[in-house]
Amino acid sequence: VLLTGVVPYGDMRLEAVRLAWQQNGVNEVLNEISIDTGYGLDDIAKDKFISTQLFTKIFTDTNIKKFKYDFEVQKQIVYLFGVSSDQKEVELVIEHAKEIKGVLDIINYIQSR
């Protein structure tokens, strides 16, 4: 389970992790929730812009199998996840994320099989 988002208090972050672990079948919880009281509409708009750009790049690239990957954008950080047996394809997804203006970091949780 990948947890992302922004909360104003640390106890809310811990509660999210606790709730994730309580679900049946959970083997791992990746906590990327950040604490920030200043996350506003401007930040949401930037994240949405990045998300839309990345979706378009992945969806229109004929070298990428679209349904193997998913992503989340929080505070201009792109979190990639999915499962792939094709390392070149993974590198292409990462490269598309790097090309987008405003991306501060890319966290790759794509598992190789």
Predicted features and spans:
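N-terminal targeting leaders
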Residues: 1-113
